[in-house]
Design a protein with these regions (language model features):
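A glycine-rich helix N-cap at a beta->alpha junction
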Residues: 76-94
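Conserved phosphate-binding/catalytic loop of the ribokinase/pfkB sugar-kinase fold
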Residues: 92, 99-140
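Active-site-proximal loop->helix
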Residues: 68-81, 101
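Conserved phosphate/ATP/ADP-binding segment of small-molecule kinases
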Residues: 148-153, 160-231
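Hydrophobic anchor at the start of a short beta-strand
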Residues: 58, 85, 154, 210
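Conserved phosphate-binding/catalytic region of the ribokinase-like
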Residues: 1-8, 32, 196-323
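Glycine-rich phosphate/adenosyl-contacting loop at the front of the ribokinase-like
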Residues: 1-63, 68-71, 308-323
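Short beta-strand scaffold segments in enzyme catalytic cores
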Residues: 49, 98-102, 109, 218-222
Length: 323
């Protein structure tokens, strides 16, 4: 009997994000009203939902509590057809991590509460996994190393180094993964370079594929096996909330692993998905589906050759309608 297979696996903390938009700065003791509100899964759920919505068979390795926020987050995630929640633990008495996001017209503020969670472990003998994502700011779990030895492609990311040290020890550990996806500020600080292009090339000394995201300016990638530097622009959208856009980018890029596309097309789809996700509030719930991609490309006709992506999205959308 053939072993079960997953395209993507995401492990980490699932949050409940409470997003308030259009929040004026209050005076001390004053009450202000937001223009919009959204409750959405956040944290690692941003990546998991984004990958699943592109048709990748995606699993979430995490836990939520039996509190009201956890129950609501669980219900939202359970509505995603391609998202496998067999490894999402529902833990009695555990408070689901929560982040309140206050978005004004020019700035954002966050308030987070998170209790210590039990460590997660991918079971031996579990389904094979095409790709997974890890944080490089802590030691890789043994189960990640085990999956990589079995053929899983390991993507890595980092967060902002609030210490300001930007230790190059991170670079020396990049041989533990296959693809590194930082944003441009992170990449330039770790490599001590002046621009994203030089940062991508420098990262290519340590990892097979380095992808540096640049927000509204697109992305640049350096592929060590070919020595090629590939740059793609982003598309222009009316941005409402950038929460989770980086997560949507990396998950969408991971979802293209089995497409057989050139690197440039994979980056273009990932960038498009990230851009479309900022048009509405929240991270996970704003990740686009193929039908959203088709609708945008057809209506807006952005510059460049989108024929491959449009054909794929249209075919995926037809499949969704038939389910």
């Amino acid at each position: 009997m053939a072993r079960a297979h997953l395209d993507l696996l995401f492990a980490g903390s699932v949050f409940c994000d409470l997003v308030f938009a259009g929040v004026p700065t209050p005076e001390p003791g004053a009450e202000v009203y937001a223009e919009a509100f959204k409750l959405t899964p956040g944290g690692v759920a941003n990546r998991a939902v984004a990958g699943a919505r592109l048709g990748a068979r995606t699993a979430l390795l995490s836990q939520v509590g039996d509190d009201a926020l956890g129950v609501r987050v669980d219900a939202i995630l359970s509505a995603e057809p391609e998202l496998d929640l067999r490894w999402l633990r529902r833990k009695p008495g555990y408070q689901t991590p929560v982040t309140v996001s206050l978005t004004g017209h020019h700035e954002r503020e966050f308030i987070t509460y998170q209790e210590e969670a039990d460590p997660v472990e991918w079971p031996e003998g579990g389904p094979s996994v095409g790709a997974t994502h890890v944080s490089m700011q802590r030691d890789l779990p043994g189960w990640v190393q085990r999956l990589r030895s079995a053929g899983t492609i390991v993507f890595g990311g980092v967060g902002w180094d609030s210490s300001g040290l930007w230790s190059r020890s991170i670079l020396r550990r990049l041989d533990e993964i296959d693809v590194f996806v930082p944003n441009d500020l992170e990449a330039m600080r770790y490599t001590q370079t002046e621009n994203a292009h030089d940062a991508a090339r420098e990262l290519g000394r340590y990892v097979e594929l380095a992808v540096v995201t640049r927000g509204s300016r697109g992305a640049v990638a350096f592929e060590r096996c070919t020595g090629r530097l590939v740059e793609v622009p982003s598309v222009t959208v009316a941005a409402v909330d950038p929460t989770g856009a980086g997560d949507v980018f990396v998950a969408s890029f991971m979802a293209t692993l089995g497409f057989g596309w050139p690197l440039e097309q994979r980056l273009r789809l990932a960038g498009l998905c990230a851009a479309l996700s900022v048009r509405s509030l929240g991270g996970a719930v704003s990740a686009p589906r193929p039908c959203d991609i088709t609708q945008f490309l057809t209506a807006e006709s952005p510059p460049g050759d989108w024929s491959t992506i449009l054909s794929w999205a249209a075919a995926q959308g037809s499949s969704e309608e038939n389910i």
